[in-house]
Design a protein with these regions (language model features):
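A conserved beta-strand-loop-helix scaffold within acyl/acetyltransferase catalytic domains
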Residues: 93-188
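Acyl-donor-binding surface of acyltransferase catalytic domains
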Residues: 2-93
Length: 188
């Protein structure tokens, strides 16, 4: 209401200062949990916003699938295109060690790739390091996360895969684990 009174015709959000932080609402699959540090909201938020007249403008996709299902769905296609990909790119496991050793290059790469996205707000390297440094790198799976580099060693792309940390996040009491403390290498 305040924004309308100020003359706003459109409001986009939520954006928590930058798109590197919480910047979206979840609309479905609440039973699936969330990735560590992924935005989370109660299921009823979307109905409140709809009643206020807000509409969905942009969507995002998070995939919650067992690894074997993903392999079955894309395995044959990947094997078919792999020889062509390997003519131009090296495909290797993305490890926390590579991530941390190449954080400045990853910062520039992420800025370049996402810079044209809606509401993208650049952040300083120091902020990137705080959001995407060691505690971030220790959460993704180094066996299934993939790094693509050009033949001369430049970062060409990557995707990160996370285990299902929901059981850990449900632990309460003295043995509870915060999202910030999750570490893939720990034998929970």
């Amino acid at each position: 209401q305040w924004a309308q009174e100020q003359g706003a015709k459109h409001i986009y959000g939520p954006i928590n200062f930058t798109t590197f932080a919480a910047n979206r609402l979840r609309l479905d699959h609440f039973e699936r949990g969330a990735f560590p540090s992924e935005p989370w909201n109660p299921p009823y938020y979307s109905s409140i916003l709809a009643k206020l007249g807000y509409k969905i403008r942009y969507r995002y996709l998070s995939t919650f699938s067992p690894l074997n299902d993903i392999i079955a769905a894309i395995g044959q296609d990947y094997l078919r295109v792999k020889p062509k990909l390997e003519q131009h790119f090296n495909l290797v496991a993305m490890t926390p060690e590579f991530w941390l050793a190449n954080l400045p290059e990853l910062y520039g790469f992420v800025d370049e790739v996402f810079g044209a996205n809606f509401a993208y707000t650049p952040i300083s390297f120091e902020t990137f390091q705080a959001h995407c440094g060691e505690s971030f790198a220790l959460k993704f799976c180094p066996k299934t996360s993939v790094l693509a580099t050009t033949k001369d060693g430049r970062i060409a792309g990557f995707f990160l895969v996370y285990p299902d940390y929901r059981p850990l996040m449900r632990i309460t009491g003295e043995h509870s684990i915060s999202a910030a403390a999750i570490n893939y290498a720990e034998p929970y």
